[in-house]
Amino acid sequence: MLNNQQIHQSVLINEVIHNLNINPCGNYLDLTAGFAGHSQKILEKLTTGTLTINDVDKESINFCQKLFFKNNNVVIIHDNFANFPVHLKQLSITKFDGILMDLGVSSHQLNQPNRGFSFKNDGPIDMRMDQSNQKNTALTVLKNLTEQKLSLILKKYGDIKHPKPIAIGLKKAVQTEKNLTTTQLAKVVKECATGFEKYQSRNYLAKVFQAIRIYLNDEITNLKTALTFIPNLLKNNSRFLVIVFHSIEEKIVRNFIAKLTSFIQPEALPIKLTPAYQLITKKPILPSQKELELNPRSRSAKLFVIQKN
């Protein structure tokens, strides 16, 4: 069995462990376990504490089950993190000392041609986070979308400045080519690119693939849903850590933090009140130069740390 470092390099591991402020007897929740990079490090810090790990990807879950099959301190759940509250009944835990969300796509997912997440490998246009339960692939969705709707998706989730030519080209390609692949899709996008975007092909392609993936997996809705219940899962003096990778996620998380930490100190009181929630660091934590050199894919990662007092 390959170890998790051979499959995927989790970002900001040292920073995550430091900021979780782990209690060896505490209960922790990793809502996006992936290939257990963060989870394994959390578990190393626990004695009688527990770790609940969740992931939507069955391949990740299978890996974690093999990795932790002898560990009674670990509970593994296969589901989208937006559905996590329905699983609380099977747990003896209702609140946690720390919760982690890493919103990035794993290196393993990107590197596997059959997953269809990357334009660098030729494979089916799949892009499903949950291949075991999701029926529609990205190719199916592209076939069913109108040019207008696809254009809106590219602009909203990929920040594509001139999405219409791309949408027209993609619709024509999926209708005329029976078994269109990821590299063929990338070729269509390159041919349809206009203006300045034509000269930023790699970044541009990544944004197009990102937009399709986000829409297919309903990532934004799922993130917003999770953020509504996470505060209720936190104990007092616990922390919530979230790692974002693109501006859409970051905006949602920043708005969430702003509302959660909004607090006005009453002037009339003789003592200062402690806000219910606070940011541990005013600015998001970024990867070190050493990590950037070892793992260039970490360059977009930003870690936010919120404490419930």
UniProtKB/Swiss-Prot annotation:
Catalytic activity: cytidine(1402) in 16S rRNA + S-adenosyl-L-methionine = N(4)-methylcytidine(1402) in 16S rRNA + S-adenosyl-L-homocysteine + H(+)
Cellular location(s): Cytoplasm
Entry EC number(s): 2.1.1.199
One of the protein's GO biological processes: rRNA base methylation
Known function: Specifically methylates the N4 position of cytidine in position 1402 (C1402) of 16S rRNA.
Domain of life, per lineage: Bacteria
HAMAP family linked to this entry: 16SrRNA_methyltr_H (MF_01007)
Binding-site residues for S-adenosyl-L-methionine, renumbered to this chain: A36, G37, H38, D55, F81, D102, Q109
Provenance organism: Mycoplasma genitalium (strain ATCC 33530 / DSM 19775 / NCTC 10195 / G37)
Protein name per UniProt: Ribosomal RNA small subunit methyltransferase H
